[in-house]
Every structure is written in structure tokens, then in C-alpha cells.
Swiss-Prot record:
Name of this chain's protein: Probable lysosomal cobalamin transporter
Subcellular location as annotated: Lysosome membrane
BP GO terms, sorted: protein localization to vacuole
Function in brief: Probable lysosomal cobalamin transporter. Required to export cobalamin from lysosomes allowing its conversion to cofactors.
Keywords: Cobalamin, Cobalt, Glycoprotein, Lysosome, Membrane, Transmembrane, Transmembrane helix, Transport
Keyword Transmembrane helix annotated: yes
Molecular-function annotations in GO: cobalamin binding
Superkingdom field: Eukaryota
Predominant place of localization: membrane
Spans through the membrane: 7-27, 46-66, 94-114, 144-164, 195-215, 312-332, 349-369, 375-395, 419-439, 506-526
Topology in membrane: Multi-pass membrane protein
Glycosylated position list: N574
Location of the region described as Disordered in the Swiss-Prot/TrEMBL record: 237-260, 564-593
Length: 593
């Protein structure tokens, strides 16, 4: 029975990794620009994102495996011998160390090498045969040596840096003694992870907080809708007026010596530019309607239009989830700041939950029946990941106030994609800390484990609480006694993260207090976004259409226009003002605004 249960847990994890690999591939191909697509960049991005998400999604597996060793009566199951439990923990440690090490190598070595390898490519030299693969490889490797030196220095510092020592009676518990790392190799990896988490926390409080506020609101308050039929009609009307005005100018100056006057010439040139814009916009509207496409494509377009109103409901649900996450983090933060017995000396580890925390309660209750908690954790991780992507897309890749790259669907360069992947690597490490330490702290450490506090008659016997349910206690860091020591098994990830904060208290204090900055930024952006009306940027649409037209890719990246009944019917509504009254401005008029 134990073997079947363990196998089921690992199979569920394998399925989850397969799903996140698909999500990583969709993310990569959705955001990268088609005309500069690189197979190497795409592969590295997909592998990196899959590895990162797999690292975070190992938490429910960790909880399920350690929780499976205990019964509802607070005793170890018959098959859960000390040797069996040790083997389970050893397997989890190997997987964790492998994933964390792989993440670090990808972030600090593989992605920089891929960035320089792509930058070294010269299309003209490659076609002429003056640039070979070996030259590009050696040149990229030369620039990557800096990052190799950085990794070596990082691990050397972690290998020799002194760790925190026992700090009095507060740290005398067995749980905290085990956290004080004595192995130098483990200490080096702990230091490196703590440094990467700290760097990721700085990005996390900026990008994830903004995305967590903007993502639900973007579903609810989308930009003003323009239906494809309405856009087509207004564009056709404006195009007709444009060409009529051109004919008037040409007719008025037909018999004039020297041709058009300077004023008329400038107006005619502006009309020509506007005409090109309107023609592109007309073709774009036709693409969004599915004109010239198969019946399946047209049916899919109308089906999407029908279900777009569900976007509002989804936005409301995501908004509720965002607020619950915010409240849960605030509750845990206050609880830790007030009730942590070791404060900044151990990264504000909380002995036990003192205030009801909704998300932690949901996960603890759902962990009783696997894989309910796994599904919930996967959804939570993907939501925070999507929020991070939304934040990066909204703010862009910046150095101080200078925007270096822009992250947009279908318009992200390979360099920007690699830099965004590095940022997401660090952010996901910070998300892993936030989930385990603030969002669901009790669940992340012991899950639903309990222990029987009823004393045993003989040493080595299992405690029996079948007739004393009131003596069944919840496992926590402060649990003591023979029953807790034999039954309560902390998760590997919580032990690893707590080892970072206990051995290097600076990292723990930074990661903890940064959560309050995260909450403050979320609140500011959330309130601002509630009262800010989104605008439809037609100039951006025109620029996208022009770029796509130049590359012959207009059909593959047509933009979606709002969800209205007109999209479903394929016809425009009759309005008193008409298209001519509203019109559509060209590039020059738009820029004048």
C-alpha cells in the first residue's frame, strides 16, 4: 500500500512537470517575435522555466510524502520505520539539490552563454562563410568566463563564510539544532541559494506585486472594445473620405503650373500616410473576422467571441484570490513579527500559527486527501508566475528609469526573452520562499501531521490516542517530547529554507521585511488601477500591423478586438452617428494628441 501511494504521488508530479513544460513552451512561443525566432533561445527558455516551476511544484510532493508516514491518531504507520522515512527524505533531498543546482547553472551559466552566442551571430558574415560555429562558440565562452568566475567566487564565499552559532535557549530545540549546517558543501549551496533568493526578492516585490494587482483588473477592466465589424465599417468610411479628399486636391491643382502648392503637397502626403494606415487597419479587421479563412477558423472566432464575457467572471475570481493572498501574507507577517521567539536571529521563524490564516487553513485541510492540495498548489504557483509575467510586461526590463527591453506578446526579442527568463528564475525562487514561509507556512512545514501526546508505558512503544482524541496535537516547530520527536517530520523544502535563514540571518531578515514592501506596492497599484480607465492604443495596433505586414506575418499575429455582439453576428450595429461622424485618425493626427 505504501509503495502504491508513493508511486501515485511521484506520477502526479511527473504529470504536473509535463503540464508546466507545455505552459513554458506556450509562453515562449507566445511572447517571442516570429521574425527573430531562435531555436537555441527557445529551447533554453523552455527548459529553464520548466525546471523552475518543477522546483516549486515539488513542495506538495514533499508534504504528501512526509505526511503519508503518519496516521490520523498521531502515530507513525507500521511501514514508516526510521530507515524508510530516512530513505524518503534522502530521495527528496537529492531531487531538491539537483533541481536547485540545475536552476543555478541555468541562471548563471547557460543563459548568459546563450545570450552571448546569439549576440555574436552576424547574418552577412555567416552567409559569406567568414563566421563559423566554432568562432561564435569561443567568443560566447570568453564572455561567459566572467559568470564562471562569479559562480566560483559565490561558492567559495559560501564555503568559508562563518554561519550563525547557537544563540541561547531559544535555539536549543532539536529542530533548530538540525538547521545549523556543519557540512561545508551544503553550507556553500545554502549561501548561494540565500543570495539568489535575496536578489529574486528585490525583483519579486517590484514585478510580482504589480502583476498580482494588474492581472485580475486587466480581465475586468479591459481596454474599450472595438468589434471587428465596427472597425471594418468605420475604417472603410474613413478610407473613402480620405481618397475623396485626395481626388479633390488633385482635381483642384490639375491645370496649375508647377503642380501642387506646398500646403496642398504636405496635406496630400499626410493623406497618403493615413491611407496606408487605414488599409492596414482594414486588412487587420478582416483577419480578426476570419475573412478568407476556413469554416473551422471562422467558427472558432465566433466561439471565442461568445465566451469572452466569461473573462469578467474570471477576473472577479482572480481578484478575490489576489485579495485573499494579500490578507494571508499580511496576517502571517504580523504573526511572525509579533510572536517569533527568535526574531531576526533566525529569519522570524514562527513556532506555531497564532492567528487564523485562510490560505494556510485551506491547504492543511486539503492535504488530507492527495492530490487536492497538489492541484491547488499548482494553480497558486501558475497564478503567481502569470502575475510576474504581467508585471514584467507592464513595467518592462529597466535599468533604473531607462527601459532596456519591452516584453510584449509576439514582439519580444530573443535577448529580452533571455533576460526576462533570468528575472523569472530569481522571482520564482522568491515565490518559493513566500509560499513556504508566508502564504502557507504551517502547510509547507508539516502539512496535516499530528502527534499523540499521550505518554507510553514502555520506551519504544507507539503512543495511543484512540481513547484520548484531545491529546492529538498539531505538529509545529515548537513541538517537543518523545511523541513529537518520533512522529513529526518536517518537509525538506522548509528545512532547506529555514537553514538559509538560521545560518545566515541577514538573508532571512531581508526576505521577511521585503514582504511588507511587497504588500504596500500591491495596495498602491491596486487602488490606482481601480480608478484608472484603460485606453485602447490604436497607434500601437497600427505599428504592429505595419511591422507584421513588412515581414509578411500579418495573418499570424492579428490582434483581438473586444467582445461584442457584433463579433458574434459578424455585422455592425446601426447607430445614428454613423462611421463618418466618428472617423479614425491616422498616424499624424494620433501623434498630435
Amino acid at each position: 500500500m505504501a509503495l502504491i501511494q508513493t508511486a501515485f504521488i511521484w506520477v502526479a508530479y511527473a504529470v504536473a512537470v509535463g503540464i508546466v513544460a507545455l505552459i513554458a513552451a506556450i509562453f515562449t512561443y507566445t511572447y517571442q517575435t516570429p521574425r527573430d525566432r531562435s531555436a537555441l533561445v527557445s529551447t533554453v527558455t523552455i527548459i529553464t522555466l520548466t525546471s523552475l516551476l518543477a522546483t516549486v511544484l515539488l513542495l506538495p510532493v514533499d508534504i504528501a510524502l512526509v505526511s503519508s508516514t503518519t496516521s490520523k491518531l498521531g502515530a507513525k504507520k507500521d511501514w514508516a520505520t526510521p530507515e524508510t522515512v530516512h530513505n524518503i527524505l534522502l530521495t527528496l533531498k537529492i531531487v531538491y539539490y539537483a533541481l536547485y543546482s540545475f536552476d543555478a547553472v541555468l541562471c548563471l551559466l547557460v543563459i548568459p552563454f546563450t545570450y552571448f552566442f546569439y549576440e555574436e551571430y552576424d547574418e552577412i558574415d555567416s552567409e559569406e562563410g567568414t563566421q563559423t560555429f566554432g568562432q561564435r562558440f569561443l567568443s560566447a565562452a570568453k564572455y561567459t568566463l566572467f559568470f564562471v568566475a562569479l559562480v566560483v567566487i559565490l561558492f567559495l564565499v559560501g564555503f568559508f563564510v562563518p554561519v550563525a552559532k547557537n544563540r541561547g535557549s531559544d535555539m536549543d530545540l532539536d529542530y533548530f539544532k538540525r538547521l545549523l549546517a556543519e557540512n561545508h558543501g551544503e553550507r556553500a549551496l545554502t549561501f548561494a541559494l540565500g543570495l539568489l533568493i535575496s536578489l529574486g526578492t528585490l525583483l519579486y516585490i517590484l514585478y510580482t506585486s504589480v502583476g498580482l494587482a494588474l492581472l485580475p483588473i486587466s480581465f475586468i477592466k479591459s481596454a474599450p472594445s472595438i468589434s471587428a465589424p465596427q472597425l471594418s465599417e468605420t475604417t472603410a468610411s474613413a478610407l473613402e473620405q480620405n481618397r475623396e479628399r485626395q481626388r479633390q486636391l488633385e482635381g483642384r491643382n490639375a491645370g496649375r503650373d508647377g503642380g501642387l502648392s506646398a500646403k496642398d503637397q504636405r496635406e496630400l502626403e499626410a493623406l497618403h500616410r493615413e491611407e496606408r494606415t487605414l488599409v492596414r487597419r482594414e486588412r487587420l479587421a478582416a483577419e480578426s473576422r476570419g475573412d478568407g479563412k476556413s469554416f473551422i477558423v471562422r467558427a472558432w472566432t465566433k466561439t471565442c467571441a461568445i465566451f469572452r464575457p466569461l473573462k469578467l467572471i474570471g477576473g472577479i475570481l482572480l481578484l478575490i484570490l489576489s485579495l485573499i493572498i494579500w490578507v494571508s501574507m499580511l496576517i502571517t507577517g504580523i504573526d511572525k513579527a509579533k510572536n517569533s521567539f527568535c526574531k531576526q536571529h533566525c529569519g522570524y521563524i514562527l513556532g506555531s500559527i497564532n492567528i487564523f490564516q485562510p490560505i494556510n487553513w485551506i491547504f492543511v485541510k486539503s492535504s488530507i486527501v492527495f492530490p487536492i492540495d497538489y492541484v491547488l498548489m499548482a494553480l497558486l504557483v501558475l497564478f503567481l508566475f502569470s502575475s510576474s509575467v504581467t508585471g514584467i510586461a507592464a513595467i518592462g526590463l529597466r535599468f533604473l528609469w531607462v527601459k532596456l527591453f519591452e516584453i510584449r506578446k509576439g514582439h519580444t526579442s530573443p535577448q529580452a526573452l533571455l533576460m526576462a527568463t533570468v528575472m523569472l528564475t530569481l522571482i520564482i525562487l522568491a515565490i518559493n520562499y513566500s509560499i513556504a514561509m508566508l502564504i502557507a507556512p504551517q502547510y509547507a512545514i508539516y502539512g496535516a501531521q499530528t502527534f499523540c501526546a499521550n505518554p507510553t508505558k514502555f520506551p519504544g512503544d507507539q503512543p495511543d490516542c484512540s481513547n484520548h482524541p484531545e491529546l492529538i496535537k498539531t505538529c509545529s516547530e515548537l513541538s517537543s517530547g518523545e511523541g513529537a520527536e518520533k512522529v513529526c517530520t518536517p518537509s525538506v523544502v522548509s528545512t532547506f529554507l529555514n537553514r538559509v535563514t538560521v545560518n545566515f540571518p541577514f538573508f532571512g531578515a531581508l526576505a521577511f521585511w521585503a514582504q511588507f514592501v511587497f504588500l504596500a506596492i500591491f495596495l498602491i497599484v491596486f487602488v490606482t488601477a481601480l480608478f484608472r480607465t484603460p485606453k485602447l492604443d490604436l497607434s500601437e495596433i497600427d505599428e504592429d500591423a505595419e511591422a507584421d505586414e513588412e515581414e509578411g506575418l500579418l495573418a499570424s499575429t492579428g490582434r483581438r478586438f473586444g467582445a461584442t455582439w457584433q463579433d458574434i453576428r459578424g455585422k455592425t450595429q446601426n447607430t445614428s452617428g454613423g462611421a463618418a461622424g466618428r472617423g479614425i485618425r491616422g498616424d499624424d493626427d494620433h501623434n498630435d494628441d
